Amino acid sequence: MLKIKLEKTTFENAKAECSLVFIINKDFSHAWVKNKELLETFKYEGEGVFLDQENKILYAGVKEDDVHLLRESACLAVRTLKKLAFKSVKVGVYTCGAHSKDNALLENLKALFLGLKLGLYEYDTFKSNKKESVLKEAIVALELHKPCEKTCANSLEKSAKEALKYAEIMTESLNIVKDLVNTPPMIGTPVYMAEVAQKVAKENHLEIHVHDEKFLEEKKMNAFLAVNKASLSVNPPRLIHLVYKPKKAKKKIALVGKGLTYDCGGLSLKPADYMVTMKADKGGGSAVIGLLNALAKLGVEAEVHGIIGATENMIGPAAYKPDDILISKEGKSIEVRNTDAEGRLVLADCLSYAQDLNPDVIVDFATLTGACVVGLGEFTSAIMGHNEELKNLFETSGLESGELLAKLPFNRHLKKLIESKIADVCNISSSRYGGAITAGLFLNEFIRDEFKDKWLHIDIAGPAYVEKEWDVNSFGASGAGVRACTAFVEELLKKA
């Protein structure tokens, strides 16, 4: 992980092997920009990166005056620098966008530091020739690129220290999620997932309860159990329950995650191409583990429960079948018409378990539907639920954190598509359209009336795992949901 060192000095006086200078909105007029003739000769117009080898300056373009683009550009700069021979880089403090906001300086520093730190991530566990980055340190000179309004209340140094703490915690939490999601299924089993959760619990002094199939049987979590039937003798299920309890808690929050450590589709077998990357179907459960790490280290004033349903969905003589009827923990019967709609079965029982805790808010995370990716693209998560205020708060705070989110509306016409003639509900829609919403409506069937306005469903199927670099995310897992939900919890507590 890149070490960031804060120094009370000017940018010019800071010492490092290389300088990083951002070109914001194609403005080359600042004194930190050197050798403008060279930039003109090579027609560098402030987009992407450009290395001035003579002066050892890396220029990184920020296309617009936008804090999210600053974060992305910082990440791109570090990705470039890690391929070079510099051990250290220095950078000043930049303020992009929303200069009139009281927290503008803090948010810019968070973005800068997080972008710098995330730029070094690469999942290379199984590479025989690992190329370790030479870059080890970023020196941040506590000098403003330009004055920022309304920052008198908080000194630059104080804001920088707070931002650095956030960036370190968030980077660690995101890397926990990314490493877990990227772990191949031969290793990343339900038991392995529980072991990762136990490490997080031990480090943060959290309560943890890891339950096996016998517990699931006792609690009548038959929908969850059905999904695991083909894997039971080899990779049994785990219900993981993490608990963070601060001395003062303004709210009780339950975070629920789908932890499908591998999903071949079951007897409704996926085509070969669709099976590849299904190690990422544990993205929701992994995000919950990362969130418990982040929220505990940030010391939020909320009692937080993290509930992960970890299992495989495989084929075999004991596999559950289309035409099966399952009785869920909530007592509702489910007609199975497609075994590849399995994540919602696991979540149904886990949401029932979460409601037994009587939380003030329930948020579930799942790589639930390909339909969500078709509808919103691979970079955006969907928000569903009944409470407009809660949905808006998650969307607004999530967007400010740098994640992309959009609300999808429930409606009575789509609800009819999951009706069953022989059970209380069907696990798959009778139509190919609106699949992300019908999956959310299926989960809604297992939310009790008193929790309808307390529940949010977040479908992270798109951004949880993308096979290319984008924004501050490396190839593979992104840790989708962690930044957004952390910001959501912080905003929720401000209103408590």
Curated annotation (Swiss-Prot):
Cofactor binding remark: Binds 2 manganese ions per subunit.
BP terms from Gene Ontology: proteolysis
Binding site for Mn(2+) 1: D263, D340, E342
Keywords for the protein's UniProt record, in alphabetical order: Aminopeptidase, Cytoplasm, Hydrolase, Manganese, Metal-binding, Protease
GO cellular component: a single term: cytoplasm
UniProt cofactor(s): Mn(2+)
Coiled coil location: none
InterPro entries: Leucine_aapep/pepB, Macro_dom-like, Peptidase_M17_C, Peptidase_M17_leu_NH2_pept, Peptidase_M17_N
EC number(s) given by UniProt: 3.4.11.1, 3.4.11.10
Reaction catalyzed: Release of an N-terminal amino acid, Xaa-|-Yaa-, in which Xaa is preferably Leu, but may be other amino acids including Pro although not Arg or Lys, and Yaa may be Pro. Amino acid amides and methyl esters are also readily hydrolyzed, but rates on arylamides are exceedingly low; Release of an N-terminal amino acid, preferentially leucine, but not glutamic or aspartic acids
CDD domains noted in UniProt: Peptidase_M17
Matching Gene3D superfamilies: Leucine Aminopeptidase, subunit E, domain 1, Zn peptidases
Active site: K270, R344
Listed GO MF terms: aminopeptidase activity; manganese ion binding; metalloaminopeptidase activity
Superkingdom, natural source: Bacteria
Principal cellular location given in the protein's record: cytoplasm
Subcellular location: Cytoplasm
Binding site for Mn(2+) 2: K258, D263, D281, E342
Family named by the database record: Belongs to the peptidase M17 family.
Function: Presumably involved in the processing and regular turnover of intracellular proteins. Catalyzes the removal of unsubstituted N-terminal amino acids from various peptides.
Protein name: Cytosol aminopeptidase
Species of provenance: Helicobacter pylori (strain ATCC 700392 / 26695)
Lineage: Bacteria, Pseudomonadati, Campylobacterota, Epsilonproteobacteria, Campylobacterales
UniProt gene name: pepA
